[in-house]
Amino acid sequence: MSAPTLAEIEALADAAFAALPEKFTRLCEGVVFHVEDFPDEETLDEMECETEFDLLGLFRGKGLPDGAHLAETGAEPNMVWLYRRPILDFWAESEDTLGDIITHVLVHEIGHHFGLSDADMEEIERGAVL
């Protein structure tokens, strides 16, 4: 058995996102998912990571607290970066499915930027229809 590829992780992310409750996905209209093996050095430094395995995902963009509801000409879309190798390492040591881990990372990366509490995000994850 070989490790899931970048494309397979992206497909899992798309499926995980599609399974989330509509009240959450409406907040995220236009969000773009990117999958890379690892975060780049700039991101690792910015997030103060000790190793390249410390970061499973990252939201880049504007959440509602930052004014995402306001249209900006030429603004980059909101993006969620998923980091394949750290996710796979986490999965190898977890009892959760890979899909559950990806769902968790997506909900938390997006949720924090939209001002959701941990309790809100747990409810969203429980509402996922996988």
Language-model regions, residue ranges each:
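Active-site rim/adjacent substrate-binding subdomains
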Residues: M1-I101, H113, S117-E122, A128-L130
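Catalytic glutamate of the conserved HExxH
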Residues: V105, E109-H113
